[in-house]
């Protein structure tokens, strides 16, 4: 039996979290009684889920969260079509693809976007997803008078095309087991920003990704984002090859997983 670790913190907060922490501590000690192999999507996820004894055993493996990298290759034709359809021409487009929940920290993202908008009125925000915090998110957008600059697209199946249409990927999560959305963004050649220490360093496989501490203010996040965006010239076409070379393409990782299972 394989047990797989996919996150590095609890989704539940408040009183519920106490129960989940107790059960997590209890089951962390018991899991080795039942499992034959232990997989994790990152070292952070493995440290959260498994005891040291498990992580030092030959049956413990990091299995890369992989993507079909060719699907996410930057497409200039789709970029032009989507920017026209979404009225993003002449805009600096920030995108986030995530569930609207506590983990993804989207209220903080709105604060960062507000600071960027103060720097340059061309900024536009596209949020792809849905979730329990949608109402709070809409209220905050309204309170900051950002309604005309933020598009909530809901759940979509055309993520690769939307990434091609964007200029910046912003992902200030409170915690992540890996952060596969960041991998997709890098495959599309998007300048990307995420949270330091709570998002695994293993997802930063290109020079596109910058980590910023959540202890920094929205002003400081905005300064870093704006500085990089205005000073870098990026060839977005080359990054799918880098994803493959680093072992994060689905075909490569599927073969590696099969070799473990065949042993």
What residue spans do the PLM features occupy?
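A charged, aromatic-enriched C-terminal amphipathic alpha-helix characteristic of glycosyltransferases
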Residues: 233-263
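A short, active-site helix/loop in glycosyltransferases that binds the activated sugar's phosphate group
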Residues: 32-72
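A short helix/loop element that forms part of the nucleotide-sugar donor recognition site in Leloir-type
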Residues: 73-87
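A conserved mid-protein helix/loop that constitutes part of the nucleotide-sugar donor-binding site
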Residues: 92-115, 132-138
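Aromatic "clamp/platform" in nucleotide-sugar-dependent glycosyltransferases that forms part
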Residues: 155, 174
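Nucleotide-activated donor-binding/catalytic signature segment of Leloir-type glycosyltransferases, i.e.
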Residues: 138-154
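Short hydrophobic beta-strand element within catalytic cores of glycosyltransferases
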Residues: 191-196, 201
């Amino acid at each position: 039996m394989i047990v797989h670790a996919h996150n590095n913190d609890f989704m539940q907060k408040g009183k519920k979290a106490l129960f989940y922490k107790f059960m997590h501590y209890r089951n962390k000690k018991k899991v080795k009684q039942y499992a034959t192999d232990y997989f994790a999507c990152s070292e952070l996820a493995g440290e959260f889920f498994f005891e040291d004894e498990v992580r030092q055993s030959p049956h413990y493996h990091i299995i890369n969260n992989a993507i079909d990298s060719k699907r996410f290759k930057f497409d200039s034709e789709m970029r032009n079509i989507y920017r026209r359809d979404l009225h993003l021409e002449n805009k600096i487009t920030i995108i986030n693809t995530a569930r609207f929940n506590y983990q993804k920290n989207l209220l903080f993202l709105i604060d960062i976007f507000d600071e960027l908008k103060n720097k340059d009125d061309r900024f536009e925000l596209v949020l792809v997803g849905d979730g329990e915090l949608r109402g709070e998110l809409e209220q905050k957008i309204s309170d900051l008078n950002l309604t005309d600059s933020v598009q909530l697209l809901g759940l979509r199946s055309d993520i690769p095309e939307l990434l091609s249409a964007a200029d910046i990927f912003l992902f200030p999560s409170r915690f992540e087991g890996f952060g596969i959305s960041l991998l997709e963004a890098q495959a599309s050649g998007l300048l990307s920003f995420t949270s330091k220490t709570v998002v695994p360093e293993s997802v930063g496989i290109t020079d596109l990704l910058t980590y910023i501490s959540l202890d920094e203010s929205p002003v400081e996040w905005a300064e870093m984002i704006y500085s990089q965006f205005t000073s870098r010239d990026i060839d977005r076409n080359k990054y799918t090859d880098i994803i493959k070379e680093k072992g994060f393409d689905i075909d490569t990782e599927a073969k590696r997983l099969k070799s473990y299972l065949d042993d």
